[in-house]
Amino acid sequence: MYDFESKKIVVIGTVFMDIKGYPEGTFIPNGRNAGRIEYKYGGVGRNVAQDIAGLGLKPVFVSITDSMGHGAAIESDLKESGVITDYMLRIPNGIGTWMVIMTPDGDVCANLSKRQNLIPVSLLLDEKGDEIFADADAIAIEIDLEEEIVSRVFRLAEKYQVDVYGVISNMTIALNRIEYINKCKCFVCNRIEAGQLFDTDTEDKSPNEMLDILKDKLNDFRMECMIVTLDKDGSVYACKDETSGMCPSDQIDIVDSTGAGDSFFAGVSAGLICHMPIDEACRLGTEMAAVVIQSTENTYKAD
């Protein structure tokens, strides 16, 4: 019914190596903790690209990977998933690192990250931006990337009249990108991030209360649609055409919550790009997130 395979989606974002610690019991910050450690390929952009590929599309990923170490393996893994990696630069120490301790119920207990320097991507966009964007159907980008990158992406998007779908990993940085958030076709964030963006208390709000806040605050912004994820309470959405609603979450056992937000964003974006109604797009994103949550993997893979 929906034509996923013919759409060209350009994804611009980060690549990380995730180091995940799973304690055998309750994590004791000042004590010795036994458990297991797993290394997973991560980064919001990388995850989103691979999630979209899991739906049968062949997204174009614009990013940086390492010229040594895990770089070749990360790129190979993306290619095998169907991601086009022609515009990934290889640079020494090019990827970021995220260390995380998980709780027994699959939530993040503590984390630390070394951000990736993506400035060379701005030079790539100067050189090959027209080639990348000219026939694109849509762009998915981490709004909190370097200003030099974000400004070029939106300039190219306007030049070729391509819709931009935005997600974030750091709202503190994204608050300095409001002009770009306003230019998004759809912007997705979680409850805490929405509270920061709206300068409003969103903690412990019910889905109905959160939807009312979203519909009211959307009037202060220019993006066409916005979706706020609410963890176990699902998500709420509102659009300028007054379409709004709630999408409940699936009741499942959580193994590892990391990557779920990325897969939700990937599903929503792909659905909207393929002309799904927003309620169906949110349902697709929710189903993809449910698959990711039930494993220690960071990305969605269809059965």
Regions found by a protein language model. Give the residues of each.
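Gly/Ala-rich phosphate-binding loop of Rossmann-like dinucleotide-binding domains
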Residues: 53, 158, 273
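Structural alpha-helical scaffold elements that stabilize or flank donor/cofactor-binding regions
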Residues: 131-132, 179-180, 219
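Conserved beta-alpha-beta core of the PfkB/ribokinase-like small-molecule kinase fold
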Residues: 138-209, 233-235
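A glycine-rich helix N-cap at a beta->alpha junction
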Residues: 77-92
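Conserved phosphate-binding/catalytic loop of the ribokinase/pfkB sugar-kinase fold
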Residues: 90, 100-138, 143
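Conserved phosphate-binding/catalytic region of the ribokinase-like
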Residues: 2-11, 33, 173, 204-303
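Glycine-rich phosphate/adenosyl-contacting loop at the front of the ribokinase-like
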Residues: 1-64, 69-80, 254
